[in-house]
């Protein structure tokens, strides 16, 4: 699996220290193991997990600004855990409402020794951001409007950002954003061996 990860990282132009590579592989191994009983992801093949979960998450890293983030609707820790592994200097709250997912996140935290993640079981509307976050990250929301509606209380004002991971560029959604929200950028992400487009939408309050 290390050989495959090295190949993907090289194709994406990403360099990581060996410790982070081994942590990423350890995460995939845990996800594969727990997935058999807990059905955490529809991706069954660990090699595909490297593409669709690991690379698809860490390509976001160069675009993150700040050091305190929340991954909303993180599921089994995506994109939060891969990002936390490659950003040991930053702190990530991993928020999900489902107990089995949060139990898995705590197991990953324990086994991989990740001191910079904080798994939390909560509905997003019930979670108090104290202090507010530099960035709110998610690939769980169906629409940008949903993300802004549910997560409006989480980022610091005015410098906090929303980072939405999307497939095709969501031009229809971008055209109907609520007042007071500006599009800082829409970045096309390059994920080796991933079919389909990936975009990162970065939004701010003005």
UniProtKB/Swiss-Prot annotation:
UniProt keyword Nuclease, yes or no: no
Cellular component annotations (GO), alphabetically ordered: cytosol
Gene3D superfamilies, A to Z: Vaccinia Virus protein VP39
Domain of life: Bacteria
Subcellular location: Cytoplasm
First-level EC class: transferase
Pfam families: GidB
Positions with a binding annotation for S-adenosyl-L-methionine: 73, 78, 124-125, 139
Enzyme Commission number(s) from the entry: 2.1.1.170
Keywords: Cytoplasm, Methyltransferase, rRNA processing, S-adenosyl-L-methionine, Transferase
Gene Ontology MF, one: rRNA (guanine-N7-)-methyltransferase activity
Record field: catalytic activity: guanosine(527) in 16S rRNA + S-adenosyl-L-methionine = N(7)-methylguanosine(527) in 16S rRNA + S-adenosyl-L-homocysteine
Family to which this protein belongs: Belongs to the methyltransferase superfamily. RNA methyltransferase RsmG family.
Task performed by this protein: Specifically methylates the N7 position of guanine in position 527 of 16S rRNA.
Name listed for the protein in its UniProt record: Ribosomal RNA small subunit methyltransferase G
Species annotation: Yersinia enterocolitica serotype O:8 / biotype 1B (strain NCTC 13174 / 8081)
Encoding gene (name): rsmG
